């Protein structure tokens, strides 16, 4: 009688029993395209300067695909403070993201895979399991754009 509201993923591995939680899949391409289209619209409208900034702050789907939801205090309840300044997630400003991930590729991999409880990441990170894996939600190009933006905060 309970029903999940998660969007089923595409390209799940055969061993994955449930397409809503499969490890090998991703959001439907139509949803990924919707995310990209909205980010491009926000840049064209002048709301944000780059696709990475737009994706970081994207409120599509109540912020389910954005970083600001956790990394900007007040963002989730309509009173955003310093962008990337920390909230539920850590502060990403002042070069802290670059210090944690000196190599861009390591930061991309972390965002794609998320945090695992007790597993080390970056230079000094200790996983809590709170950082979701965005690799199944955003494309590699979108994640790279977000990383470029965050590394400049």
Q: What are the language-model segments listed below?
A:
Residues 14, 24, 69-72, 94, ...:
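Disulfide-rich extracellular modules and peptides
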Residues 11-39, 74-88, 119-120:
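Surface-exposed intrinsically disordered loops and tails
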Residues 2-4, 8, 78-153:
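Extracytoplasmic electron-transfer domains, predominantly the class I c-type cytochrome c fold
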Residues 5-6, 12-20, 46-47, 113, ...:
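Short, flexible coil/linker elements and helix-boundary hinge sites characteristic
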Residues 19-63, 100:
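Electrostatic cytochrome c docking/interface patches
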Residues 8, 17-18, 63-66, 93:
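Secretory pathway export signals and precursors
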Residues 59-69, 74, 88, 130, ...:
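Short pre-active-site segment immediately N-terminal to redox-active cysteine/selenocysteine motifs
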Residues 52-54, 70-71, 108, 112-115:
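Short, well-ordered amphipathic alpha-helices
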């Amino acid at each position: 009688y309970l029903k999940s509201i998660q969007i089923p993923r595409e390209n799940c591995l055969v061993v994955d029993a449930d397409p809503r939680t499969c490890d090998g899949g991703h959001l439907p391409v139509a949803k990924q395209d919707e995310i990209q289209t909205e980010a491009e619209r926000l840049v064209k409208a002048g709301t944000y300067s780059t696709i990475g900034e737009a994706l970081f702050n994207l409120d599509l789907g109540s912020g389910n695909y954005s970083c600001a939801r956790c990394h900007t205090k007040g963002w989730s309840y309509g009173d955003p403070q310093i962008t990337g300044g920390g909230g539920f997630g850590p502060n990403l400003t002042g070069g802290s993201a670059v210090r944690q991930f000196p190599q861009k590729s390591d930061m991309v991999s972390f965002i794609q895979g998320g945090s695992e409880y007790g597993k080390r990441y970056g230079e000094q990170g200790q996983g809590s399991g709170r950082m979701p894996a965005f690799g199944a939600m955003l494309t590699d190009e979108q994640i790279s754009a977000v990383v470029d933006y965050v590394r400049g905060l």
